[in-house]
Curated annotation (Swiss-Prot):
Catalyzed chemical reaction(s): uridine(2552) in 23S rRNA + S-adenosyl-L-methionine = 2'-O-methyluridine(2552) in 23S rRNA + S-adenosyl-L-homocysteine + H(+)
SUPFAM superfamilies reported in the protein's UniProt record: S-adenosyl-L-methionine-dependent methyltransferases (SSF53335)
Domain of life: Bacteria
The species this protein was found in: Hyphomonas neptunium (strain ATCC 15444)
Name of encoding gene: rlmE
Example of a GO cellular component annotation carried by this entry: cytoplasm
Record protein name field: Ribosomal RNA large subunit methyltransferase E
Major localization listed first in the record, in broad terms: cytoplasm
Region (Disordered): 1-37
Class of enzymatic activity (EC top level): transferase
């Protein structure tokens, strides 16, 4: 830039300056929101009795108590059964399944997790046939129970979060219909909302009984509930 050009150039115009300020403000707000959200999450974890209990009793997550409560109410786990856990990280549901006497337990998750003795764990995608084949190779036959504690990353917008989680449940239901043994059971997390009705209707076509369970271990104010379906039929 020449000296004449420098003298003539007055810097960015007011519109560009305003746009830049707004962009910076949005970034600061977003960063602060993430920071506040993280602080709330940490505080909630520190105050959560189930988090402390899980640590004391050797479970990998507080979610283990949800499955224990669900099983106490619905009797979906039994000795000698074959279990598939979709979205299994960090492994609490696998631990409970083995503890309750399951003979074979396999799990799959996009996230890596440490091995659990007695279980086959695949780092992969339930939508990838090769990953599913590797997981199912860990079973000697068709599964008796399919579990899914999958949930989409939350956005803070209830309806969006609900629809995204319902999409995961629909994927889990499709997996169950394809792989579950006759008479088998299915348990999955859903968020309360209107779209859940379609999932329930689909389950009622393929299972003798379908019901909702809200474990006490679910956090107060959480919209999550669990759908439990028993008596699979094609």
């Amino acid at each position: 830039m020449s000296d004449d050009d420098r003298r003539r150039w007055k810097g960015p115009g007011p519109e560009r300056q305003d746009s830049g300020r707004r962009s910076t403000e949005r970034k600061v707000i977003a960063r602060n929101a993430r920071t506040e959200s993280s602080k709330r999450w940490i505080e909630r974890q520190l105050q959560d009795p189930y988090v402390r209990k899980a640590k004391d009793e050797g479970y990998r997550s507080r979610a283990a108590y949800k499955l224990l409560e669900i099983d106490a109410a619905a009797k979906i786990l039994r000795k000698g059964m074959r279990v598939v856990d979709l979205g299994c990280a960090p492994g609490g549901w696998i631990q409970v399944s083995l503890q309750q006497g399951a003979a074979e337990v396999v799990g799959i998750d996009l996230l890596p997790l440490d091995p659990i003795e007695g279980a086959t764990i695949i780092e992969g995608d339930v939508n990838n046939p090769d990953d599913v084949a590797r997981m199912m190779a860990g079973l000697s036959g068709t599964p008796d129970l399919i579990l899914s504690d999958m949930a989409a990353n939350t956005t803070g917008h209830k309806q969006t979060d609900h629809l995204r989680t319902v999409a995961l449940v629909e994927m889990a239901v499709a997996f169950a219909i394809e792989h579950l043994d006759d008479g088998g059971a299915f348990c999955a997390k859903v968020f309360q909302g209107g779209a859940t009705k379609d999932v329930l209707n689909l389950l009622k076509q393929h299972f003798r009984t379908v019901k909702h369970i809200k474990p006490a271990a679910s956090r107060a104010g959480s919209p999550e509930i669990y759908v439990v379906a028993k008596g699979f039929r094609r």
